[in-house]
Amino acid sequence: MARRPKGRFIDGIVLLDKSTGMSSNFALQRVKRFFNANKAGHTGALDPLATGMLPVCLGEGTKFSQHLLDADKRYLVTAKLGERTDTSDSDGEVVQTRAIDFTEAQLLTALDFFRGETQQVPSMYSALKYQGQPLYKYAREGIEVPRESRPITVFELNFIGLEGDELTLDIHCSKGTYIRTIIDDLGEMLGCGAHVIMLRRTQVAQYPYARMVSLEQLEALVAQAHEQQIDPSVLLDPLLLPMDTAVADFPEVNVPDAIAPYLMQGQAVRVPVNADLKTDELVRITLGDIRRFVGIGTMNEDGLLAPKRLIVIHDEPAETD
């Protein structure tokens, strides 16, 4: 008999405000521990230097984390001009120092180059893999390997300010965009070099900035619960966002209660749908009049709703530590 996973069955998404100096995995494990969750996963790592929004999916919410990985992101970044580092951020070694000598017009022209659809060559100091190894492992050994450029889109690049040798920008971009690489490339275009000294992710998909919560706040709530002799879940669970918020932009297909059991067994079912839906388009599946979210699916060539990823409804609690 398979052993039940430790932790409770709790489903949802925590908008963590990650602090600087910690890895995304460390932050993830802390959140999982605070909520006593049986499963947890984050939706796109932030560098230790970076702070800000790190959605953490709990329980069945982990099934939809890929859709947040694919979502647009927004960052506030401050770059130090005049110095280039080997990692393109302040965690690296300075490899070149140059004078800062450009006009406002040259800066604005350079910024415009990065707007819209472009190709970006990822930094050697990234988690992308080459022959099974992360690029940063090669970089640490002084080995440079070939990297293919990748298409990215910068939807917005807003100039926030320039104070002395520090330039601050607001960047709204597509998945897979390396802000460090943009700053390094910008520094080279300006002829002075640059590297990231502050990076904060302010948005993932349409999640509100105001709903973020830090590890310190979570820890304080757990301590408060212990003082009040109540279960920490009483104070923590209201912070969770519904897991279907990860796919809120998918069109909804509602399945009548009468045929819901067939769908939940993995069968494709015929339901009334919007004529505008395309074959193989991902949809958000809800059940009955209460429109309970149960997963995602696609409309197949026969006009049937085919489940792709369904949540598991647990009737029994998981084991606790």
From Swiss-Prot:
This is tRNA pseudouridine synthase B. SUPFAM superfamilies: Pseudouridine synthase, PUA domain-like. Belongs to the pseudouridine synthase TruB family. Type 1 subfamily. Responsible for synthesis of pseudouridine from uracil-55 in the psi GC loop of transfer RNAs. The active site is at residue 47. One of its GO terms (biological process) is mRNA pseudouridine synthesis. PANTHER family: PSEUDOURIDYLATE SYNTHASE TRUB1, TRNA-PSEUDOURIDINE SYNTHASE. One of its GO terms (molecular function) is tRNA pseudouridine(55) synthase activity. Keywords: Isomerase, tRNA processing. It comes from the Bacteria. Pfam families: TruB-C_2 (PF09157), TruB_C_2 (PF16198), TruB_N (PF01509). Its EC number is 5.4.99.25. It catalyses: uridine(55) in tRNA = pseudouridine(55) in tRNA.
